[in-house]
Structures are given as structure tokens and as C-alpha cells.
């Protein structure tokens, strides 16, 4: 066991050879590396699988013996300052490592086919492997400086991946928005780290917590300054985990490829903020008011995310706001001191949300066969509908993830979310009301999206918003820009024999132009079953994309059993978290009897089924899902005949669709203000600073011209004039000194 922990430092660096070798290959052998680009999926998955096996071994050791292992190397040592690097292996580290590796492997397998058509295939896998390295380095860090270094690397990787299709203006703006918003949080995090180092003189977590606890107990530190530093640390987590008010980057981050969205939302970037708060929870618990502040931010984020998701037509943006809301649940749980519940929900949400995002990628793939590479069309739920008949495997996986996030038993999120809902009732009745309301809205929104996508008819064949006949076939470039040429509507995109049928591992029927042109095939092939019956409709995804959905669906079904609370022997999660819970001085007895458990869960399940019923009633399939999406036709009414209730509903709809006008507020108050200040600075620079410089030059020019016209062009005259002036100056200077000496005498 000691050797397992001793070599744990290598965990973050195992995936690192992939981006290094890809970079060297592109530098030295660019043609060969590009021609053999598909082979890089295999080493990426293999190396991350090695990390997963290592993480599983560490997790088993911790569940059996519950140790916390820390190893430190001294970097610089003197009397006044010491800086150390090291790694810390505890339950939080092993949980995060398991999430990063398992979700990361599934995303890489999925991406091999999803990104096969893309010119940036090599860049994608290099960035993904470096992303995994950065996140693994973050969760194994033993001090705040290491965390900050890897924190910045995680932000850099997310910037590169969100803006992966950088030739699209929306993607370029989205990555800039994510970068700038996170710079605010990162700067606050750095200030908080420096502030606590000034207080404690240490960056190491264990020394840091112990010193601070003694200082607070002996009343040797200013509580206001302590609260300020803790708030600055928390602000870093707020930005990274998309909590209010620094959440604005998350929906726009959907401009990146769908596999990136799955990894960011499930196990990497947004999970980093939750990880930081969980890691620093022993610090926050002993500081007055900070726990209340954390729970307040969490509850606002829950409600805001649940309401803003209601009117989003983009399937990925709706999931993004859902992630924001679910992260709010975790933050609320940490603010209430429910450490176990927060991490439990982090685990269950990761697999459910990864399943939803990869399922949405399969849906988008099927829509792209009709509308081309245009996110405005392929991700628009208004143009979907009736896909259940065409992509049944993707529909089952998407429904499974939806039901899990809705809290339907016995799926994963039911067990974790129910704990947080019950804990909120003990913490604050007001918080409980808000949480239950937001839970109902979340259930309603998710099931509405499911109905819009899979039920009814394929709306892309019907009328568009303005009432004109929609022509779905366009020539779209690789980067999502719509071309001017329309494809013949009679062109059959798909041909399948009537003797084929659909199965979960159905053979891929959609292949992009690049694949056909270059003859490329997925490097990873999953054995498929032959189908006899065939149809002419949007194709089901390839087996390589369906296999991760199957695995994540299995996790969604069974991962909740990890923390079932009514049997202490079967409660693996509590055994796993025992060292961390002891560090927080919390009670270990989290088990309750069956009767109490079912009594607490009746209300949450009732709300879930009510939300499903309401969504089914309001979003029943009709000719156009656009009318359904606005809930009622009264949303579109104009004029004095509209009732007050219609105006209120329409106002709420606009508020949700326009993201509560928070982006507009930031644009007006910050961006426009900074732009005005920059214009003022430019005016001052050109008119004042440059004006003085240019004015001196112009004055010298005219003075020289005047002197030039005084002279006659003879050097002797110039020399006489110069000596005369010098004589007059010296004579005046002599008389001045004479007068001064007489006055003194």
C-alpha cells in the first residue's frame, strides 16, 4: 500500500506525453502526423485508463483503511521563507480522480468519431489530454500555490477548447468571455491566497488549517480581514463554477464542441470550484458569516439557473443552465456544512450530465444530416421533434439522464439531491421553499426539452417562425458558416435497405464529407450487430458514440447505490469520506431507517411527477413545437386584447429568454463604460500628450524658419551674430553678479 501512495505523484503526468508528442510530430513531421492523426485517440485513452486504474486502486485502499497521505519536496528553504511542492491523497482527491478519468475516457472514445470530420482533430486530442493533466494536477495539489498554478492551466485549456472553432465569431467571443470572467475570479483567488499567507505564513493545507484555527481560538487575528480573505478565495470558486454573479460565461461556452461541454460540465472546469470549496471547508467553517455567504450564493444560483433555463431553445444552453443550477445545489450543501451530500451530488451529477451532453451530441449529429453544420439550426429544439422514432438509442440515454436529474428513483441523482433538499429544510425554511420551487422548475424544464426533442413530428420539415416554408437543406462549411448554395430538396441523404433494422449498436449511417473524401474510419471500432430493416430518416450515431452512452447510462443507474443512507454497512461513500468528515468534526452516523427515508422522499418524488405531468400537458405534440415552446399561443398575442396574465407570462418569458438581462447589464455598465474611458484616454493621448510633443516640434520649425530668413546666407554673418549674442549674455551676467555683490556689501 505504501508503494501505491509513494508513486501517486505521477498521476497528473501520465496523460502529458500525448500533447507533447503531437506537438513534436507536427513540428518535425507535419505531413506524416496529419496523415496518421486517427491513431492518437488510442494513446490518449490508454494513458487515461492507466490513471483510472491507479485511482481505483487508491480509492479501494482508502475505503479499507481510510488513510490520508501527503508527500512534500522542499523547493526553497531559508530562515524567512520556504516553498514546497508535493501531493496530497485523501478521499476528495480519489473521488475527483475517479470522476475525471472515467468521464474523460468516455468523452475521448466518443470524440474519436464525433470529431473525425474536423480539421482540428489533433489539436482537439492534444488539448483534451492536457486538460486532464491540469485537472489531475489540481486535485492532487498539497498547497495553495500548486492549486493556483494548475487552476490557471485548467482555465487556459478551457479557453482553448471553448474557442476550438475560433474562425466562428461566436466561438471566439465565447472563449474571450470565459477568459475575462474567470480572470476576475482568479485575481481574487490570488489576493486571498496572499492574504492567508500573510496571516499564517504557510501555503500547506494541513499546517494552514491548524495555524489558523489556533489564531482564531486565541483571538489573535482580525476577523474582518479574515472574512475578506475567505471571501476572495470563495470568489475564485464562484467564477470557475459559474455561480451568480460570475455565471455569464457558462451558456456561451456551448460554442465549443459537444464533447468539451460534457467534460467541462461533468468533471473538470466547473467541478474545480466545488473542489476548491470542499478542500477549504475546514477553513470556511471556523470563519464567521462566510458559510452563510456560501449558502446564499448557492441558493441564488439554484433559482436563477432553474428559471433562466425555461425559455432556452438551444438544447446545449438549456443543459448549461441546468448545470449552473445543480452546481448551486452543491454550493448550498457545502454552505450548510453537508460535506457528504455535496460530494455525493457531485458524483451523481457528473455521470448524469455527461450522459445528457453526449446524448445531445448524438441528437445534434442526427440533425446535422438535415440542416448541415449550423449550430443555430442543429441545436434548436424548435426544429426537432419526433426523433424518438429515428434515434431510439440516443433517446433512451437522454431520457435516462433527464429522469436522473429530475430525481426519479432509483436513478443516481435521486439519492443525492434528496439529501440536499431535506438538509435545506433543517437549515432554513425560506431556503427550503426556494430549493423545492427550483427543483420543480428544473423537472419541468428537463422534461419539456425531452418532449420537444423526441415527441411529435420533425418540425424542420414544417413552417418556420415567420410562417414561411422552411427549407432545411443548406450547404454548410466545416466551420458552421452557411453557404449560399441550397441542396436539391429531392436529394436523398440516406439510403438503407428495407431488410435492416435498428439496434443499440446499429452501424453508423451518417458520414461527413471529410470522412468520405479521405477514406477515414474511426480508430476505435465497437462490434455491431447486423440490422435487417432500414428507414429513410436522420441516422442513429455510430457504435463508437453509442458505447459511451451505454457505459454512462449504467453509471447513472447504479452509482447512486454508493451512498444509500439507510444501511451503514452498504454506505460506501461514508466509509470513503471518513477521514475528511473527521477533519471537519462532523458526525459519522448518516444512516436512517427505511421508513424515515421514504417519508422524506415522498414529497420530492411527488414534485417530480407533477413537473412531468405539467410538461406533458403543456407540451403535447402538435403541428409546430414553437407554439408549445412558448407554453401557450397567448405568448404571441399583440395589442390591447392581451390580458394582464398574458403580459405577465410574456414578461417572465422574455426575462428568462434574455438571461434575466444580466448580460445586458454587464454590457452597459462595464463594457460600455470601459469603452468610453478608453475613448477618453485616446482623445487625451492624441490631443494632449501628442499635442505637446507635436507643438514643440512645430514651434521649433517656425522659429528656425524665422531665423533662416533673418540671415543672408553668409557664414561670417552667422558667426558675428552668434558672438554678439554670446557677448551680450556674458556682459549681462557680469553686471548681474556686480549688482548682487554691491547689495550684499
Swiss-Prot record:
Alphabetically ordered keywords of this record: Chloroplast, Membrane, NAD, NADP, Plastid, Plastoquinone, Quinone, Thylakoid, Translocase, Transmembrane, Transmembrane helix, Transport
Isomerase is among the record's keywords: no
Gene Ontology CC terms, in alphabetical order: chloroplast thylakoid membrane
MF terms in GO: NADH dehydrogenase (ubiquinone) activity; quinone binding
Transmembrane segments: 9-29, 39-59, 89-109, 125-145, 147-167, 185-205, 230-250, 258-278, 283-303, 318-338, 396-416, 424-444, 546-566, 602-622, 725-745
The EC number(s) this enzyme carries: 7.1.1.-
Gene Ontology process terms (BP): ATP synthesis coupled electron transport; electron transport coupled proton transport
Compartments (UniProt record): Plastid, Chloroplast thylakoid membrane
Residue runs in coiled coils: none
Pfam family, one: Proton_antipo_C
Catalytic activity entry: a plastoquinone + NADH + (n+1) H(+)(in) = a plastoquinol + NAD(+) + n H(+)(out); a plastoquinone + NADPH + (n+1) H(+)(in) = a plastoquinol + NADP(+) + n H(+)(out)
Chief subcellular location: plastid
Membrane topology qualifier: Multi-pass membrane protein
Gene3D superfamilies per UniProt: 1.20.5.2700
InterPro entries: NADH_UbQ_OxRdtase_chlpt_su5_C, NADHpl_OxRdtase_5_subgr, ND/Mrp_TM, NU5C-like, Proton_antipo_N
PANTHER family from the UniProt entry: NADH-UBIQUINONE OXIDOREDUCTASE CHAIN 5
Function field: NDH shuttles electrons from NAD(P)H:plastoquinone, via FMN and iron-sulfur (Fe-S) centers, to quinones in the photosynthetic chain and possibly in a chloroplast respiratory chain. The immediate electron acceptor for the enzyme in this species is believed to be plastoquinone. Couples the redox reaction to proton translocation, and thus conserves the redox energy in a proton gradient.
Similarity annotation: Belongs to the complex I subunit 5 family.
Self-association state and partner proteins as the record states: NDH is composed of at least 16 different subunits, 5 of which are encoded in the nucleus.
Protein name: NAD(P)H-quinone oxidoreductase subunit 5, chloroplastic
